[in-house]
Amino acid sequence: GRDRDPIRDKWQLFVLSGPSGVGKDAVLSLMRENGLPLHFTVTATTRPQRLNEVDGVDYFFYSDSEFAAMMVDNAFLESAIVYGYRYGVPKGPVNQARDQGIDVIIKADIQGAASIRTEAPEAVLIVLEPPDIPELTRRLAERMTETSDALKIRIATAQREMVEGAKLDHRVVNRNGRLD
């Protein structure tokens, strides 16, 4: 394991949450680049892989049947269906990091964060929010990964998630050009 700070003698589980398009991946990428001493979990999903994504780095991409088998094996800390696809946080890497005394950060939607809180009450839940809904709409539209109807659904979901996110431990606004 790594040297532990004597002030913090116990393992920490952090969950970074927020609506789709708020910048969770960008924040986690910056944290990695800055060498933060954390284990960054990789989420499993059944959704199609996007052009710029690497299997095992951005997500673990599985078929519906592979994912279902993993659920039967109780392989996920939490799992959910989001926008028609399955997502889950594999338990194995989280448990390995915990056993080595390495703090863990998980990316999850608001629903996932609530599920993780049930499984791990000690988890620190952080919600990342956009400065406002028009900005979130712009970010999602720029990704060009959704149809107009799908974009409307994501925005409506984001508005509900922001209300739920207010119940988490910490709120952080991801302003344009202020990622650092």
Question: Where do the PLM segments sit?
Answer:
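Short hydrophobic/aromatic beta-strand immediately N-terminal to the Walker A/P-loop
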Residues: L13-V15
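Post-Walker A helix-loop "phosphate-sensing" segment adjacent to the P-loop in P-loop NTPases
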Residues: R32-T41
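ATP-dependent small-molecule kinase phosphotransfer cores
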Residues: T43-V104, I110-Q111
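P-loop (Walker A) phosphate-binding loop of NTP-binding proteins
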Residues: S17-P19
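NTP-dependent small-molecule kinase module
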Residues: R2-D3, I7, R138, T145-E146, ...
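Conserved phosphate-donor/acceptor-positioning beta-strand/loop module used by diverse small-molecule
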Residues: V104-D109, E119-E142
